[in-house]
Amino acid sequence: MALDKDGLLDTLNSVTSIPAIPFRQGAIDYDAHGKNVNYLMENNHLEGGRLRVIGIAGTSLIHHISADDQVQLMGFTGEQMGGKGLLMAGIAPNPIGEAERLIEREAALEYPPDVFLIMPLTGVGNAEGIFAYYMDMAERLGRSCGAKLLYYLRSQAELDIAVRLMNESEYFVGLKIGTTVDDVEPIVAGVKEGAALVIWGVGDRSTGPARRGSKGHTSGINVVFVRASDEINNAQRRGDFEASQRIEDEIAAFEEIRFRNGRMYNYSAVVEAMHLGGFDDVVGGEGGPFNPRVPKEVAVEVAVAIEGLVKYH
């Protein structure tokens, strides 16, 4: 959907739902994914009639499916949303030439992504080289297909150049922090007002970062406990950090399971919760590539962690 920059930044000051994509017999289950997207679109608790933001991203997903599958998945998701929400596409930048072609292909869809999240680089690179390439890339893609980009910061070595990209490129409109809460204040202080949005990117435990100045957050649990994430964002936008913290405390045990040991259950714990909840309006699937259903002992932990969260479905 067409938004000017101010409208885009305000819309991104929200919960970005990153739903676990369901798989069946080793392939994306589009019927199930459509059901999950409908759940998110039809259960919008964001105050002020704000648009739902959905991201197809996550290193537990897009790094493991082909470019053709990504284009098909993005096209399907956009059609399912019908232009009534904001769509974010995660892009793995390896190999970088193929990543650029992928952005151009997705930008040509009937319902193209509104923003493209540049995921962390794998392989060796240095900060200045990343800055120089991404500046040139943003200019090329901005001119060729109007792409608006977000930068996913996972390495503190790239903090300074991430801030520079926000300030020096008109096509970078957001910085998603995936490092630590201590990085929020220097990044917020460094990004010029109105240049880009600084977003917390490590799940719904986002009250501390919001107190330090981040705007909006990403959520992997929104696809199953939609109201929890929505109400956290509502409270943060009102400046009611106590209310945000109360909900965050309720979901903390579940988030701890997801993010333990290098985020190893980031995807699969959500899938497990979708199964254990007994819901008929979302589908978890059979587990994705490299991310099978959790071990039995972890499933028991998930069951305990979500006991009090069903009210947020």
Model-inferred region functions:
Residues A2-K5, T11, T16-P22, N43-G48, ...:
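C-terminal alpha-helical cap/extension of soluble enzyme domains
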Residues A138-K148, L153-R263:
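Catalytic alpha/beta core domains of metabolic enzymes, predominantly
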